[in-house]
Swiss-Prot record:
Name of this chain's protein: Pre-mRNA-processing factor 6
Task of the protein: Involved in pre-mRNA splicing as component of the U4/U6-U5 tri-snRNP complex, one of the building blocks of the spliceosome. Enhances dihydrotestosterone-induced transactivation activity of AR, as well as dexamethasone-induced transactivation activity of NR3C1, but does not affect estrogen-induced transactivation.
Ranges of compositional bias, category Acidic residues: 66-78
GO BP annotations, alphabetical order: mRNA splicing, via spliceosome; positive regulation of transcription by RNA polymerase II; RNA localization; RNA splicing; RNA splicing, via transesterification reactions; spliceosomal complex assembly; spliceosomal tri-snRNP complex assembly
GO cellular component term of the entry, any: catalytic step 2 spliceosome
This protein's UniProt keywords: Disease variant, mRNA processing, mRNA splicing, Nucleus, Phosphoprotein, Repeat, Retinitis pigmentosa, Spliceosome
Originating organism: Homo sapiens
The protein's assembly and partners: Identified in the spliceosome B complex. Identified in the spliceosome C complex. Associates with the U5 snRNP particle. Component of the U4/U6-U5 tri-snRNP complex composed of the U4, U6 and U5 snRNAs and at least PRPF3, PRPF4, PRPF6, PRPF8, PRPF31, SNRNP200, TXNL4A, SNRNP40, DDX23, CD2BP2, PPIH, SNU13, EFTUD2, SART1 and USP39, LSm proteins LSm2-8 and Sm proteins. Interacts with ARAF. Interacts with AR and NR3C1, but not ESR1, independently of the presence of hormones. Interacts with USH1G.
Post-translational modification: Phosphorylated by PRP4K during spliceosome assembly.
Annotated signal peptide: none
Amino acid sequence: MNKKKKPFLGMPAPLGYVPGLGRGATGFTTRSDIGPARDANDPVDDRHAPPGKRTVGDQMKKNQAADDDDEDLNDTNYDEFNGYAGSLFSSGPYEKDDEEADAIYAALDKRMDERRKERREQREKEEIEKYRMERPKIQQQFSDLKRKLAEVTEEEWLSIPEVGDARNKRQRNPRYEKLTPVPDSFFAKHLQTGENHTSVDPRQTQFGGLNTPYPGGLNTPYPGGMTPGLMTPGTGELDMRKIGQARNTLMDMRLSQVSDSVSGQTVVDPKGYLTDLNSMIPTHGGDINDIKKARLLLKSVRETNPHHPPAWIASARLEEVTGKLQVARNLIMKGTEMCPKSEDVWLEAARLQPGDTAKAVVAQAVRHLPQSVRIYIRAAELETDIRAKKRVLRKALEHVPNSVRLWKAAVELEEPEDARIMLSRAVECCPTSVELWLALARLETYENARKVLNKARENIPTDRHIWITAAKLEEANGNTQMVEKIIDRAITSLRANGVEINREQWIQDAEECDRAGSVATCQAVMRAVIGIGIEEEDRKHTWMEDADSCVAHNALECARAIYAYALQVFPSKKSVWLRAAYFEKNHGTRESLEALLQRAVAHCPKAEVLWLMGAKSKWLAGDVPAARSILALAFQANPNSEEIWLAAVKLESENDEYERARRLLAKARSSAPTARVFMKSVKLEWVQDNIRAAQDLCEEALRHYEDFPKLWMMKGQIEEQKEMMEKAREAYNQGLKKCPHSTPLWLLLSRLEEKIGQLTRARAILEKSRLKNPKNPGLWLESVRLEYRAGLKNIANTLMAKALQECPNSGILWSEAIFLEARPQRRTKSVDALKKCEHDPHVLLAVAKLFWSQRKITKAREWFHRTVKIDSDLGDAWAFFYKFELQHGTEEQQEEVRKRCESAEPRHGELWCAVSKDIANWQKKIGDILRLVAGRIKNTF
């Protein structure tokens, strides 16, 4: 047996043996081990395999099937809620119905996620805020301290000690290099020897100077050390005196540069040298490189085309903005040499030069350009003395006598008499200047002015201003009958000379005449041009727009003339009479209004509103008999008019003539038995405390008009006043059966239940009302307030969110939602409200109240003005505005708000109606109601 042969060779390997594993070797596979690639249809090596297993494709299918069957259906992979982790049917075919099912499940998941999204985001937000409160950042911890750093003064900053150094002593206290000043003896030796020394010989410091012994140890002086040749001054002599002189010269040059001001005076303060330097910093904002590029570019333009004026002007302005004023002056003067005929270059040179130099520049410019008006004007501006200005302008007029600008400038400096003489010459030199002719006419007497204007018409037959001035002249001298003729002749003459009559321009001229006080002229112009260029069917609409435009421009006489002309053309148009009446009511006198209304009812006797306006005007003036007579005439023209009957009743009841009012109502019920007549009859008895009569009338009215909700409301309120809650509830319920869409009825029934403590029933009533009247903001608002009054703020907020989803454009809901929010969130909510309801008066009122609560008085007043301007009929806005002025305004502002409210006569508003429709306040005036409503308002928002 061979001893070298290992005994385990040829023996089978033990179980689990991997060759080379003990020494860290790993196995690998090469291409030769795998063999060539095979197709799926190639036969496998096992040629005797059964059918279905002979090809590579068969083997792959077999392996895939084995993988599909190898699903983990163990108990450990099973969950009671979700089932197995994998899909039990993943091996099955994925068909169209599977795809639809997956889409449905995905939509459900998405929907469920959206339902919880708001709550989840809120919870995450709260958790983040809680985490930040518990573990604030270092930056947040020191934020309040950092704000206090603004209070630290500069002295306190400087007194703060330096931060301590924690390094060791060797690092903290390094040995600084000791610098010793060079002694004068060193310079003296240098001057004597002519050598350049940069350091001191160590032997000199050791042995004390120049008598250093020879290194060999002997005391013999160094050979040649005292040789006379070494005493010769060297070529590098340093003259300290000359260095000091050069330094002083350099400083003088810098001071002289800084001291050059615009006026050429030396104003440098040596102590404030640095301050002066700072003031000379250029004020331009460009980059230095950009300025250099611009300078090079402009230089190239100047060199390429030296006779191009804009290049010189641009170059000078570039140097000016960079602070190099003298360079700019030099450049522009060079430009005047290269472009002596350029007006702009000379004007720029005069602008850049100081006073006296600028005058010299302008004088030189006049020699080159004796016809330039702008240069003469600039020369006059440079003069400070009036006589010098006159002299310059007169000299200019000798060279340019046909310049209107020069004449106007010269006339402005003269006294009236001299100006008249000068204008006489001016119109000869400039006969086509309308301004000069009109100026001369203003300075002349009446007779001479007429002659001047006639000459002006001969010279300028195409200008309308001359004719209008002539008309104003006649009106100013009392010849009003000539005004109409002059304007008519003006239209005829201008058309004959081929001038197109521009209606808009003439209306503007009429407005100017109105503002100047020439009433007859403005009315004549309006009558002459108001119908020019308008189609017949558009006349009424266009004229009403013109009248509104004149009112907006504060040209009231023009508007009055338009209405007068329109009433001549349309005498039977009720709308035109009404617009004219409202115009007189707002901008005219009571006499003019009554005169207009008398004419109006004569042309439109069937227009009830015109009769009523006339009667009301008389009543407000205290003339009750005249008001009665007007209403009597109105009865004759309109025998069965409900409005006139009720106006007559109101007139009598307001003047405490209750029996006459009862008789009128009885006649009205017999001749014009309308629901409103019955309602006024019930109210009259109610306010007189005749409850039995009021109830009888109410029952009679309901037999005729059971679908009129106000009658049911009055019946319920009368029962409620008598503390008969069951009968009141019954009345409201009966009314709701007949009028299920009446919001006030639902609100009265709900408040009745709340009043007697039936909160659940009140809530149910409001829910029922919202079902019968969807998208009703008033019902949603009452539901929110009901929960808020009950102390259930969370439910109130939830209801408000639902209300805004159903009624996203309701201003009254948004205004309530603003004040349901906490104070920090109100501003954001108000922005959202303004985006949704930009012009809603309730939202504007809420924003005004928000600014009021934040003590932003000016902004609050501005928003109150916006609110009452958008809707002057909202009484709540006036009440809040008046309350605001009572607290923060002056007496004049309070009185102004009260007067505006009385003229607006508001009729709507939740708080306003609660007071104005109260039986106890039925005879109160608008001003009294305003004070009562303002008194009920509390600053709790």
